[in-house]
């Protein structure tokens, strides 16, 4: 059987990239794919799949190494997401929100023209959020799909969370 990274054989991938892509393939085939049809049928949140992403370390793939992550870039994330999507679209789509968050508060944030005070505040927040991901297994979401959320952020959120 071919490894998942073989799908990208036309690219020069590092050993680290191959490893994380192949990990996504293995987790996808062995753990995530068997639950995909039920997740689609029930239109439910793939919580067990998130546990598998945490257990495999994929959830921290785009967290910089200095914060305890694997330090992968956007291109690597896209290849991993593609592999996850081959096994469960709901998992790949929802995991995108988490991975995007880790990228936005990482290198993308560093590219902004911020004052020293803003940089210090962002570094503090970034440290907090990366720590939650690495140490607590936190997964982040985004509110882009809320039906009543205005792009400018002027509408209230449409979801109410309840402790279960």
Give the residues covered by each predicted segment:
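Intrinsic disorder at enzyme termini
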Residues: 1-16
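Short hydrophobic/aromatic segments of transmembrane alpha-helices and their interfaces
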Residues: 2-3, 33-34, 113-114
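Glycine- and acidic
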Residues: 9-10, 35-36, 63
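N-terminal capping segment at the start of a domain
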Residues: 27-36
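Glycine-rich flavin
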Residues: 44-55, 59-164
């Amino acid at each position: 059987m071919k490894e998942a990274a073989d799908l990208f054989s036309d690219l020069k991938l590092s050993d680290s990239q191959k490893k994380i892509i192949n990990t996504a393939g293995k987790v996808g085939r062995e753990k995530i794919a068997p639950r995909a049809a039920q997740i689609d049928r029930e239109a439910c949140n793939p919580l067990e799949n998130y546990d598998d992403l945490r257990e495999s370390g994929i959830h921290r793939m785009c967290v910089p190494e200095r914060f305890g992550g694997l330090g992968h870039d956007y291109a690597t994330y896209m290849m991993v997401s593609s592999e996850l999507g081959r096994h469960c679209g709901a998992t790949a789509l929802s995991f995108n929100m988490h991975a995007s968050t880790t990228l936005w508060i990482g290198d993308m944030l560093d590219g902004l023209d911020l004052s020293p005070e803003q940089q210090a505040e962002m570094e503090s927040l970034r440290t907090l959020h990366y720590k939650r991901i690495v140490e607590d297994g936190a997964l982040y979401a985004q509110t882009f799909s809320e039906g009543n959320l205005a792009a400018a952020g002027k509408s209230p959120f449409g979801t109410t969370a309840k402790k279960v």
